Amino acid sequence: ALFQRASCYARLVTYFGDVVYVTSVVDIEEAFTLGRTPKSEIVPKIYEDYDKAAEGLPEKYTGVSSLRATKGAALALKARFALYMGDWEIAADAAKKCMDLGLYKLHADYAELFLMTTKNSEESIFLLPRSIEYKVTLGNWTVMNEVSRNPGGWGAFAPSWDLLAAYECTD
């Protein structure tokens, strides 16, 4: 639950800044009285949730459960969120802890990284399963990924020009 809460609030804070922050169930009347919590108060709580999640999660799962959140996923997503927040030392520390687990490494051939045969490579830290056969597809991720990052922009489905320019164009 801590991993999920941290991940959801990290996304909300990244997109919107100050948001309503609750850690317990509220009834509808109370919900209408809640105001936004400053981003500066929420960010440390997100880091704390990722830390507690990392303490309680296993380093890895096997079989069907292999796509569940792990210690490495909590550390990696904490590092990613810290980068977005400009907290370089927190990001570096979380990334180092993830790397020190010794479970992940870069895939040897970048060209084959995104093939079906290499979909669960050692480079993958946290995966969202997708399978037409088992009817596990994008679902509502389409909506979430189309939330604008900035006015007039698209979410994760449309790369920025900077990302495009980071790749060598050979055609």
Name what the model sees in each region.
Residues A1-L67, M85-D87:
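Aromatic-anchored glycine-rich loop motif in surface-exposed flexible loops
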Residues V43, Y50-K52, R68-D171:
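An aromatic- and glycine-enriched ligand-binding surface/loop that stacks and positions planar moieties
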